[in-house]
């Protein structure tokens, strides 16, 4: 027969399970996703990401952060502030927020190239930082296409057939042969101008020259040189471009690329900016090069990272924005965002919710070539 105590729930268990809550701050948002009973409305769907939770909410915060950059960028400068433009060593006018865009080479290999080209075409960003592959793949795509494949294709069979794999993208090796045919005469001309006219080449000057030579409006760097947007690539020799420069050095030696002048260029872009924003797709060199330039001004005002890297191995690629705050690369009062996601999925949606909504404000007479 049960006693009275055996019929009562233990007080400790009740207290643990039914613990009362303190009130949350009044402004705390409620979780709520998109209701498809409203029909298919993509703008409303993306807006609902903010209150969906997880990486959808981080995406919503990234939209807010980029829109804050754009709002400040479009603010008119005072006469005194406008005079700082001469100090940046750039042919671009100073704005209320200088936007740095960094991206790894695989994104140019992918269809994100077209999204980046759109931003550059319409003067929406001020400084680009990428790797060698992020430069050469743009030009190679003007000469021959990249194809869709599968992640699972076997390397041995691809190598036997002269096909290179980038994730689930395929690049025939003939594309690089076409790239060599196009590039070698330009390298000859660069050496000639260096020796006869005293031209001091830097990676950014070389990229601008190649953008002019390709003369193709599908190219990111065609628009970059046309809109005087500097492209910094301190590791420019680490890829097919480096292979071609290496081969060329046997045929016509002497080409010199000065990375120190470019270092001064990117750092002064940050130092003399009224405000700065960083949008960084992927990690590695492009992430750190932009962040380190912003150290020169005690940190960026705005920052958005999009990558899938984790911080637990201590890599810069995986480091959260708060680590950059500790180094003075993002300001202590900033509200940076990291979206843990594949940029090929997220970045076009981010542009759709930010820059693309304000295209007329950036370029009243649209560049369409």
From Swiss-Prot:
EC number annotated for this UniProt entry: 2.5.1.46
Keywords recorded for this protein, A-Z: Hypusine biosynthesis, NAD, Phosphoprotein, Transferase
Binding site for spermidine: 136-137, 243, 288, 314-316, 323-329
InterPro entries, per the entry: Deoxyhypusine_synthase (IPR002773), Deoxyhypusine_synthase_sf (IPR036982), DHS-like_NAD/FAD-binding_dom (IPR029035)
Superkingdom per UniProt: Eukaryota
Active-site feature positions: 329
NCBIfam families (UniProt xref): dhys
Protein name as catalogued: Deoxyhypusine synthase
Protein source organism: Bos taurus
């Amino acid at each position: 027969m049960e006693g009275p105590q055996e019929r009562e729930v233990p007080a400790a268990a009740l207290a643990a399970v039914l613990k009362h809550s303190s009130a949350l701050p009044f402004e705390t948002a409620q979780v709520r996703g998109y209701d498809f009973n409203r029909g298919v409305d993509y703008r409303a769907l993306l807006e609902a990401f903010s209150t969906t939770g997880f990486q959808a909410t981080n995406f919503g915060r990234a939209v807010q952060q980029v829109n804050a950059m754009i709002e400040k960028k479009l603010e008119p400068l005072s006469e005194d502030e406008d005079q700082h433009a001469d100090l940046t060593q750039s042919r671009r006018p100073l704005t209320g927020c200088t936007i740095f865009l960094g991206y790894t080479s695989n994104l140019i290999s992918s269809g994100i190239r077209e999204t980046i080209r759109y931003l550059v075409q319409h003067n929406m960003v001020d400084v680009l930082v990428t790797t060698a592959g992020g430069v050469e793949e743009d030009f190679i795509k003007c000469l021959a296409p990249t194809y869709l494949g599968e992640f699972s294709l076997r390397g041995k069979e691809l190598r036997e057939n002269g096909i290179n794999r980038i994730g689930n993208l395929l690049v025939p090796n003939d594309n690089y042969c076409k790239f060599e045919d196009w590039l070698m005469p330009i390298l000859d001309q660069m050496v000639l101008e260096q020796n006869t006219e005293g031209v001091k080449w830097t990676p950014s000057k070389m990229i601008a020259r190649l953008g002019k030579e390709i003369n193709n409006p599908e190219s990111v760097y065609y628009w970059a040189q046309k809109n005087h947007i500097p492209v910094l690539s301190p590791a420019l020799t680490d890829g097919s471009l480096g292979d071609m420069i290496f081969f060329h050095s046997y045929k016509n030696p002497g080409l010199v690329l000065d990375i120190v002048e470019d270092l001064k260029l990117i750092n002064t872009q940050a130092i003399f900016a009224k405000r700065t924003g960083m949008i960084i797709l992927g990690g590695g060199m492009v992430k750190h090069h932009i962040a380190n330039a912003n150290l020169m001004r005690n940190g960026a005002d705005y920052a958005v990272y999009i990558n899938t890297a984790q911080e637990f191995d201590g890599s810069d690629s995986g480091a959260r924005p708060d680590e950059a705050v500790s180094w003075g690369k993002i300001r202590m009062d900033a509200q940076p965002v990291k979206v843990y996601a594949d940029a090929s999925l997220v970045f076009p949606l981010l542009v759709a919710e930010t820059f693309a909504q304000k295209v007329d404000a950036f370029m009243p007479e649209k560049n369409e070539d």
